[in-house]
Regions:
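A charged N-terminal "starter" segment
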Residues: 1-115, 120-134, 179, 183, ...
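Flexible, glycine/proline-enriched loop segments at strand-loop-helix junctions
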Residues: 21, 110-115, 154-165, 195-202
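Conserved anion-binding
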Residues: 123-183
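Short, well-ordered amphipathic alpha-helical segments that serve as non-catalytic structural scaffolds
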Residues: 169-175, 205-215
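Internal alpha/beta core interface subdomains
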Residues: 182-193
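Glycine-rich beta-strand-to-loop/alpha-helix junction loops that act as flexible
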Residues: 191-192, 226-233
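Short, electropositive alpha-helical surface patch
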Residues: 195-211, 242
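Single conserved hydrophobic/aromatic residue that forms the stacking wall/gate
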Residues: 239-250
Length: 250
């Protein structure tokens, strides 16, 4: 069993000052995990980790992660404000949202965030609100079901998801964005969460890199980055998790 980072006696002492319930965060563990992640991808000089603010919209945690080199993935006006308040700016912030209010797009554009369009219709919406920025990203939904080895993933049926461009919309979307003045492009996809094996990210990367080649062939658009979204799950049993994934677990 994993040893807790805080003892029963320490918790009892803290409870004398702070009324329960409360959360205690392991700053040492957070920093060590972030450093292990960056070390694992040190071979890739362009690697950037974007922490999903929705997961823990706590400015103290965000400050810790930013000091370790993380950017922020935002999906709302409030998350953009929080990211700005801890000092993040420009492409340290990636804005990915669904059913986006106009003011959210305006703020993301004003902050210089990297805007990741979730829907084909957002191209015209953003163009009318702010104009298309020179650097833009699109969220891809290939449809179907996303399975690796039968692990109990969450949200692993893209065909039923409300997020992202379909294949044909994606090709046409990049063509339109290029015509509207965009110069640099990215692509993002979220196909499953709570993944407990080593298969998810290589499989997702394969789908996106093959799609990137097709985009280049059909539109002339060459992608500057690919964002591998989704999440490493927390195992209920160590039997269901492989060693590399366990090293990244919280």
């Amino acid at each position: 069993m994993k040893k807790p980072f805080v003892t029963k006696e320490q918790i009892e002492e803290i409870a004398k000052t702070y009324p329960t319930p409360f959360h205690i965060y392991d700053e040492k563990g957070i920093r060590e995990t972030a450093r292990a992640l960056f070390k694992a991808f040190s071979w890739n000089k362009g690697f950037k980790e974007y922490f999903a603010v929705k997961a823990t919209p706590n400015p103290f945690i965000m400050n810790i992660l930013r000091s370790e080199g993380c950017g922020f993935d935002c999906s709302s006006y409030t998350e953009l404000l929080l990211s700005g308040q801890v000092g993040a700016e420009g492409h340290e912030i990636m804005f990915s949202s669904n059913a986006t209010p106009d003011d959210d797009f305006r703020l993301a554009y004003k902050m210089g965030a990297l805007i990741n369009l979730d829907d084909f219709t957002h191209i015209d919406v953003l163009d009318k609100l702010t104009g298309i920025p020179e650097f833009i990203s699109c969220r891809y939904n290939p449809g179907g079901e996303f399975k690796t080895d039968g692990s109990p993933n969450v949200m692993d049926t893209p065909k039923d998801a409300k997020y992202g461009f379909t294949h044909d919309q994606l090709i046409e979307g990049y063509r339109i964005l290029k015509e509207k003045g965009a110069k640099k492009f990215g692509m993002h996809a979220f196909l499953a969460s709570n993944t407990l094996t080593n298969d998810y990210y290589p499989t997702l990367a394969g789908i996106l890199f093959r799609t990137a080649v097709e985009i280049k062939e059909k539109t002339g658009v060459e992608l500057s980055f690919i964002n591998l979204s989704g999440g490493v799950g927390i195992p209920l049993s160590l039997i269901h998790i492989s060693e590399p994934t366990r090293l990244l677990s919280i």
